[in-house]
């Protein structure tokens, strides 16, 4: 169940150095997906960790769960960082790719490619999407996953 899963994630990031706040917007329905819990946590950690490292101190990250249709849910990860150029939307999922100018500690260039492999293994998809929220002008990653039938 995804709503229960959401409750576990903030504990991992409560002591981030930049005091970035995680906000989860759950759906009124609770969805069950067929996924290895640890692998899904790894995807969340990769996306949230990237957002924290590229967002200003004291900013927010929004993770929003929606139902696309009877078969799929969507998870959108919004941040308040500098964003990613949409022309790089395919490149960012390649192993070792980085558009970061800063020297970011522990950055390997593997996180997004691993996240993509995991999501695709779950019969889902992950893309860089254009943020439609003015208060979250940074990156927006959209994940779609099948609902357990």
Where are these regions (language model features)?
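Conserved catalytic submotifs in the C-terminal HATPase_c
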Residues: 21-31, 68
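A residue-level detector for a conserved hydrophobic packing site
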Residues: 40-41
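Short helix-loop "hinge" at the ATP-lid/N-box region of the Bergerat-fold HATPase_c
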Residues: 51-52
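Acidic ATP/Mg2+-coordinating residue in the GHKL
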Residues: 79
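Short conserved segment of the HATPase_c
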Residues: 84-96
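Short alpha-helical Gxxx[C/S/T] motif in the catalytic ATP-binding
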Residues: 111, 115
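Conserved glycine-rich
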Residues: 124-125
């Amino acid at each position: 169940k995804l709503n229960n899963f959401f409750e576990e994630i903030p504990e991992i990031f409560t002591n981030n150095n930049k005091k970035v706040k995680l906000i989860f917007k759950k759906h009124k329905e609770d969805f069950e997906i067929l996924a290895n819990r640890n692998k899904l946590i790894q995807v969340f950690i990769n996306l949230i960790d990237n957002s924290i490292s590229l967002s200003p101190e004291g900013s927010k990250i929004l993770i929003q769960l929606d139902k696309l249709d009877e078969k799929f849910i969507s998870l959108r990860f919004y941040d308040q960082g500098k964003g990613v150029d949409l022309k790089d939307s395919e490149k960012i999922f390649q192993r070792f790719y980085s558009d970061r100018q800063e020297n970011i500690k522990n950055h390997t260039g593997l996180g997004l490619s691993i996240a993509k492999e995991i999501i695709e293994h779950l019969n889902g998809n992950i893309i860089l999407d254009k943020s439609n929220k003015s208060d979250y002008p940074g990156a927006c990653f959209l994940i779609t996953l099948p609902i357990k039938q």
